[in-house]
Structures are given as structure tokens and as C-alpha cells.
């Protein structure tokens, strides 16, 4: 997991090093369309030169991956008082059926192996 995070960070840094406003497909209008509300979090060509690449990378990542509703710290999360969704039950049943199918497949394979060993042993 740490390796994946490092690889992602490295890719982001390499992309940032290659990012040029005139050559990229990204535009400030696209940032406004994505819903970045805070003007401090908007990327601009001069950001790379003021305060280094780290700040620019953080700003770019904040625009590209906006904060999701479920990403608040544990203290800020709302409690879920409503009953579980029907899709939860569906996935639970699907998981149970897959386990049963796997068990049945293992039984059949064991029976086939027993028959083969019995015939070889004779």
C-alpha cells in the first residue's frame, strides 16, 4: 500500500513537472467547472514559481480529486440510523452463494481426486 502511494506521488510529480498551461488539456475554466470554490486552491501558471512544486502539486491534486462527502474525520461523520440498503443484502447473498459454490466445487474436486487415486492404487 505504501509502495502504491509512493508510485502515485511520483507519477503526480512527474506530471506536474511536465504540466504547461499552453500544452495541457487542462484549463482554468475546467477548474471552475469542477466546482473548486476556494480561489486559493485554483491552479495558475505562476504558482509553480512561487513557493515551489510541492504547493503547486497540492493545489493541483485538490482540484483533480475534490474532497468526498464520506472523507471527513470520524468525529464529523454522520451516524447512519436508516436501515441498510437493499443492495447491501444483495451483495451479502451474492457473497454467500459464491462461498457455497466454492465449497461445492471443492467437494466435487475432492471426490474426483479420490476416484483417480482409487483407480491408480488398484
Curated annotation (Swiss-Prot):
GO terms for molecular function: corticotropin-releasing hormone receptor 1 binding; corticotropin-releasing hormone receptor 2 binding; histone deacetylase inhibitor activity; hormone activity. Disruption phenotype: Increased anxiety-like behavior, reduced Crhr2 mRNA levels in the lateral septum, normal basal feeding behavior, and hearing impairment at the level of the inner ear with shorter outer hair cells, higher threshold for auditory stimuli and higher distortion product otoacoustic emissions. GO terms for biological process: aerobic respiration; associative learning; drinking behavior; female pregnancy; negative regulation of appetite; negative regulation of blood pressure; negative regulation of cell size; negative regulation of feeding behavior. Interacts with CRHR1 and CRHR2 (via their N-terminal extracellular domain). Its main location: secreted. GO terms for cellular component: axon terminus; dendrite; extracellular region; perikaryon; varicosity. Coiled coil: none annotated. The modification Valine amide is found at residue 120. This is Urocortin. Belongs to the sauvagine/corticotropin-releasing factor/urotensin I family. It is found in: Secreted. Residues 1-25 form the signal peptide. In the organ of Corti, detected in the inner hair cell region (at protein level). Expressed in skin (at protein level). Residues 26-80 form a propeptide. InterPro entries: Corticotropin-releasing_fac_CS, CRF, Urocortin_CRF. Keywords: Amidation, Cleavage on pair of basic residues, Hearing, Hormone, Secreted, Signal. It holds the Pfam family CRF. Gene3D superfamilies: 6.10.250.1920. Acts in vitro to stimulate the secretion of adrenocorticotropic hormone (ACTH). Binds with high affinity to CRF receptor types 1, 2-alpha, and 2-beta. Plays a role in the establishment of normal hearing thresholds. Reduces food intake and regulates ghrelin levels in gastric body and plasma.
